[in-house]
């Protein structure tokens, strides 16, 4: 009996050690993968060998993928609709990568500057919209589940610093309704994936006030969530004169992460970050600093870092590729994965 107990104890320790190694996540939002492929764009590794995007992220040391969902992007090629997401989710599964689903609750981009109601929902009342949001959430997640893919995290909204589904869920005017819509999403997620971690995601990690505004409001109206998601973009913070240097952005974001844990007792995740692609050497330094701060300066409360669209080039200044190949920026992930 004692031998059996000792064997169980040793096995439990091994499992715990493995889980500890995976407790910090290195991820990327590669939602544009199928659109790039449809345009005939070929990605390659640093050696010039052709690679599919998901496989390339795994090769670079990443262990998680984030995929955005649009409600009905028929005017935008149908990319990031339910069926497209299932295709990309299967690739993440094939490469053994954890999956985050990011619901925009819009037919196209949703961010702090625009949170447009999907065309099919525009004439709905608040109560009808709650039901539509929940049904859409269940529909997409059920399709992913039926494909045999586990979902580890689900974002209920994307950068909802000012709420979403404007004007119905605009937080400044209708916090109660924003909270109600958020909780409807939470309940829908748990119906399909009871163990999925539900994230509420805001931008501007340097700024504690915007986080207090949203999360105090959600708490006041009893909206549930499991994790706080943050965006850290030193480039945009400096352009907007919110910070004077990338170091200041990282320092303020780290302080905010630690403060948020104390106040709300929820784990956190950097679900979006990016650095200037034209400066890959400095970019690697910045990304390495973000990863180090999240991993080593938050007492384990920040559980990972996701890069937004590393493969993006041309009109987007914060990708991490040039000529279809990863730059030195991505080495920050590779080195952190060792």
Please provide the spans of the model-predicted regions.
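Active-site beta-loop-alpha junctions enriched in small/polar residues
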Residues: 31-33, 70-72, 104-108, 156-161, ...
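Active-site cleft segment of glycoside hydrolase catalytic domains centered on the general acid/base Glu
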Residues: 80-86, 111-225, 237-255, 279-291, ...
């Amino acid at each position: 009996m004692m031998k059996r107990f000792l064997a169980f104890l040793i096995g439990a320790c091994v499992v715990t050690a493995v889980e500890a190694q995976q407790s910090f996540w290195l991820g990327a939002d590669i939602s544009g993968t199928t659109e790039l492929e449809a345009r005939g764009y070929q990605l390659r590794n640093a050696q010039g060998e052709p690679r599919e995007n998901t496989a390339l992220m795994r090769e670079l040391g990443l262990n998680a993928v984030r995929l955005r969902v649009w409600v009905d992007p028929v005017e935008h090629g149908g990319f990031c609709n339910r069926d497209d997401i299932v295709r990309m989710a299967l690739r993440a599964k094939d490469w053994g990568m954890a999956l985050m689903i990011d619901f925009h609750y819009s037919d196209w981009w949703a961010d702090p500057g625009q949170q447009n109601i999907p065309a099919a929902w525009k004439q709905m009342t608040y109560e009808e919209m709650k039901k539509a949001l929940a049904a859409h959430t269940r529909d997409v997640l059920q399709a992913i589940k039926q494909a045999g893919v586990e979902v580890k995290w689900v974002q209920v909204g994307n950068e909802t610093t000012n709420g979403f589904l404007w004007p119905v869920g605009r937080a400044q005017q209708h916090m109660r309704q924003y909270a109600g819509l958020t909780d409807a999403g939470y309940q829908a997620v748990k119906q399909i994936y009871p163990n999925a971690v539900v994230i509420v995601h805001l931008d501007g990690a340097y700024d504690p006030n915007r986080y207090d505004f949203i999360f105090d409001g959600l708490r006041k109206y009893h909206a549930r969530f499991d994790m706080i998601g943050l965006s850290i973009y030193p480039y945009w913070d400096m352009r907007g004169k919110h910070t004077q240097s990338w170091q200041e952005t990282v320092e303020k974001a780290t302080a905010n992460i630690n403060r948020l844990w104390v106040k709300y007792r929820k784990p956190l995740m950097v679900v979006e970050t990016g650095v200037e692609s034209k400066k890959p050497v400095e970019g690697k330094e910045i990304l390495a600093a973000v990863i180090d701060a999240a991993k080593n300066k938050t007492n384990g409360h920040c559980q990972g870092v996701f890069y937004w669209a590393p493969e993006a080039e041309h009109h987007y200044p914060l990708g991490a590729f040039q000529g279809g190949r990863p730059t030195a920026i991505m080495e920050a992930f590779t080195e952190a994965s060792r």
